[in-house]
Amino acid sequence: EDGKRYEHRDEFFPTLFVKSKKKTKYKTLSGQAVEEIHPGTVRDCRDFYKKYEDIDNFEIYGNDRYIYQYISEKYPQDEVKFDISKIKLVTLDIETTSEQGFPDVESCVEEILAITIQDYTTKQIITWGSKPFKNDRKDVTYNHCPTEYELLTSFINYWMQDVPDVITGWNIQLFDIPYICRRLDRVLGEKLMKRFSPWGLVSEGEVHIMGRTHITYDVGGVTQLDYLDLYKKFTYKAQESYRLDYIAKVELGQQKLDHSEFETFKDFYT
């Protein structure tokens, strides 16, 4: 409002549908007549689903992704015009130790060594790192945090003061976001981990890709746009590898920092 970010809680009463014995203007895809019901708030609707989930032949219809219902009702126009400069979008990337091999989200035993975010609008970069670093760039702010506890504490304190609307980055949905959430929970506790969301709503889930189960985290109030998914969807060309190093070489002619002279990644970062 007036060019300033603000949060507002808007009460919303979703619409659901149930079978109707009378003729109505609403039908399911199979032709079944249905009528509107309004159980109440979003929480009331969820309770309504639970109440009748074990009742035979009692079907509940409608979009149970209530965020989309709200957007559809709030902005009925075909195209929603927006100013991207008013949307706080950041790119996020983390680096971890590799004491026991490549970091794994499920076990999440490797410590976080660095977290970097870049603001899409200002292009400013902020890094929290565990090693001393001599910074001579005006577009970079480096925060030296000797321990992971200090690093995560400093990061989440900053994050809570300026939570972005959108997070992007390469493979963030399957690695960076769930890894940060799990390390925050393990090192600082669940209460501070949930502050990763401006609403305090962080929930764990699973996705199944190519026969493998992956852990994901939904961060309420923050949209995750995984650059890997966007690249696959909008380039219309299959690549032999989707490792960031390979894609950077294909698209930019550049590669990640070479550390082949070291026997292990641990030798490189220590």
What are these model-predicted stretches?
Residues 1-230, 234-270:
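The two-metal-ion catalytic cores of nucleic-acid processing enzymes
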